[in-house]
Amino acid sequence: MGANEDQEMELEALRSIYEGDESFRELSPVSFQYRIGEDGDPKAFLIEISWTETYPQTPPVISMNAFFNNTISSAVKQSILAKLQEAVEVNLGTAMTYTLFEYAKDNKEQFMENHHPGSSTTPIANIISVETPSAAPSSKKKDKKEQLSKAQKRKLADKTDHKGELPRGWNWVDVVKHLSKSGSKDDE
């Protein structure tokens, strides 16, 4: 079998295995992302695997450069990638995308043991507290009224009288229609 046939078979297998799995994303027929960890988990990370033309005889390209991984230090990313590269060397020549995703899921705690999510959120909190005082003087300015376009003003004028009030009875219920829906007293 050629490399393309192996890739087609693995692609079909990945689609059937991860069908309905929200953590898996197929970016293209040769590029895949998998989120390791649940939504809201501070130790969750995203792995992207892209196949080369001669994959699986040559190793795939593994990346952690997604925006999702911005809170993870580069040292932790490098250690995860190094451990995944070891798994690639073991599985070279076979379909390994599923194996790599499962390996990462099984070893998530070990991979992220040096990741400290609390330390990465501190600078963000400092940025927010620095911006808060600068927002206070702007609130002292007069609040402008909402500006309406001509079409919005015309529509509002059509609905209301010249004083801006809604006409009498605008929300009244048609009595006959209401009674026909609710039925008569004798129907009980």
Swiss-Prot record:
> Sorted alphabetically, which CDD domains does this protein's record hold?
RWD-RWDD4
Alphabetized InterPro entries for the sequence: RWD_dom, RWDD4, UBQ-conjugating_enzyme/RWD
Q: Which Pfam families match?
A: RWD
Q: Region Disordered: which residues?
A: 132-167
- SMART domains recorded: RWD
Q: Locate the RWD domain: which residues?
A: 9-111
Query: Basic and acidic residues bias: where?
Result: 155-166
Q: What is this protein called?
A: RWD domain-containing protein 4
Source species? Rattus norvegicus
